[in-house]
Swiss-Prot record:
Residue spans of biased composition, Low complexity class: 137-146, 173-197
Organism annotation: Sus scrofa (Pig)
Described purpose of this protein according to its UniProt entry: Contributes to the lung's defense against inhaled microorganisms, organic antigens and toxins. Interacts with compounds such as bacterial lipopolysaccharides, oligosaccharides and fatty acids and modulates leukocyte action in immune response. May participate in the extracellular reorganization or turnover of pulmonary surfactant. Binds strongly maltose residues and to a lesser extent other alpha-glucosyl moieties.
Modified residues (S-nitrosocysteine): C35, C40
Major place of residence: secreted
Additional detail: Pulmonary surfactant consists of 90% lipid and 10% protein. There are 4 surfactant-associated proteins: 2 collagenous, carbohydrate-binding glycoproteins (SP-A and SP-D) and 2 small hydrophobic proteins (SP-B and SP-C).
Compartments reported by the entry: Secreted, Extracellular space, Extracellular matrix; Secreted, Extracellular space, Surface film
Cystine crosslinks: C281-C376, C354-C368
UniProt protein name: Pulmonary surfactant-associated protein D
Residue span, C-type lectin domain: 260-378
Residue ranges with Pro residues bias: 105-114
Record field: compositional bias (Basic and acidic residues): 50-65, 204-216
Residues making up the signal peptide according to the UniProt record: 1-20
GO biological process, alphabetically ordered: innate immune response; lung alveolus development; positive regulation of phagocytosis; respiratory gaseous exchange by respiratory system; surfactant homeostasis
Length: 378
């Protein structure tokens, strides 16, 4: 009788979800306990005995197998939105849309940066030389020029007067022994001895020994004072010759020549082609003018101004166009080209392979067949 209230109490204290399992367990226990109190036997053999006393609770049985899964519950509330996933790959390019209408013209842009300056145009042809201007006032006397170079050696002068007698020189060194001298004189006759018996004639006596050589005389040196006087006389003559030659050169060069250092520029005032001018200067023992400095170029400018004619110079670019050289083939060490020159713009006259100098000292390339003033360099 106590089993029923006990079972109810256990059921009330268990959670609802384990109610089915407990009922099954309880049912199994009740049957076991009933069999323990009353000897059970098959119904065929007779009635069961009366109930005995309640036995003690047996040991806990093993855990039964899990039950069948329950029915699926209702869907829960939707969770919160998760974070934004990574960007997907670009889709394929769609077909181009239809061309839109032309929009209105935009405002004009700011002006661009000015472009670089263009190349300088070719220089115009050289104009003709204008008429000579009126002579200017006489200039001031220039500074004294440099002493000219030593002139050529003159012819031998007349023999000068004999110099003064020099002083006696110091004694000379002792000379080497001289050769054997001549035989010495015979000795003095001795006193006559007593007359002896006349013997046979004796043999000829030997040659006597050479006598001693006399001392060598002293030799005098040339007079130093006289030599110095001769040198001073020659120096004075050279200075007088240089001065006379310098004056002669100035007279000879004026007005158609100029001297610069060791060079002399000379003109006859006539005009020739370049080739003819070369021949004229070569036959005269010189060459065409080749200015190698500003000073030499200025001297040529003075000659050209005096003649009022442009003159040919010796340089050409016949071998290599644009590369002017001296007659020796050397490149130029000095040049004074006019602006835009050389330009080889010969026009109908042909290539400009020669050089001319104007009265202002500027150079211009010119056709070699033209006529220009001839200036030779010596």
């Amino acid at each position: 009788m106590l089993l029923l209230p006990l079972s109810v109490l256990i059921l009330l204290t268990q959670p609802p979800r384990s109610l089915g399992a407990e009922m099954k367990t309880y049912s199994q226990r009740a049957v076991a306990n009933a069999c323990a109190l009353v000897m059970c036997s098959p119904m065929e053999n007779g009635l069961p005995g009366r109930d005995g006393r309640d036995g003690r609770e047996g040991p806990r049985g093993e855990k039964g197998d899990p039950g069948l899964p329950g029915a699926v519950g209702r869907a829960g509330m939707p969770g919160l939105a998760g974070p934004v996933g990574p960007k997907g790959d670009n889709g394929s390019t769609g077909e181009p849309g239809a061309k839109g209408d032309i929009g209105p013209c935009g405002p004009p842009g700011p002006p661009g940066i000015p472009g670089p300056a263009g190349k300088e145009g070719p220089s115009g042809q050289q104009g003709n030389i204008g008429p000579p201007g009126t002579p200017g006032p006489k200039g001031e006397t220039g500074p004294k020029g440099e002493v000219g170079a030593l002139g050529m050696q003159g012819s031998t002068g007349a023999r000068g007067p004999a110099g003064l007698k020099g002083e006696r020189g110091a004694p000379g060194e002792r000379g080497a022994p001289g050769s054997a001298g001549a035989a010495g004189p015979a000795g003095a006759t001795g006193p006559q001895g007593p007359s002896g018996a006349r013997g046979p004639p004796g043999l000829k006596g030997d040659r006597g020994p050479p006598g001693e050589r006399g001392a060598k005389g002293e030799s005098g040196l040339p007079g130093i004072t006289a030599l110095r006087q001769q040198v001073e006389t020659l120096q004075g003559q050279v200075q007088r010759l240089q001065k006379a030659f310098s004056q002669y050169k100035k007279v000879e060069l004026f007005p158609n020549g100029r001297g610069v250092g060791e060079k002399i520029f000379k003109t006859g005032g006539f005009e020739k082609t370049f080739q003819d001018a070369q021949q004229v200067c070569t036959q005269a023992g010189g060459q065409m003018a080749s200015p190698r400095s500003e000073t030499e170029n200025e001297a040529l400018s003075q000659l050209v101004t005096a003649q009022n004619k442009a003159a040919f110079l010796s340089m050409t670019d016949i071998k290599t166009e644009g590369n002017f050289t001296y007659p020796t083939g050397e490149p130029l060490v000095y040049a004074n080209w006019a602006p835009g020159e050389p330009n080889n713009n010969g026009g109908s006259s042909g290539a400009e392979n020669c050089v001319e100098i104007f009265p202002n000292g500027k150079w211009n390339d010119k056709a070699c067949g033209e006529l220009r003033l001839v200036i030779c360099e010596f």
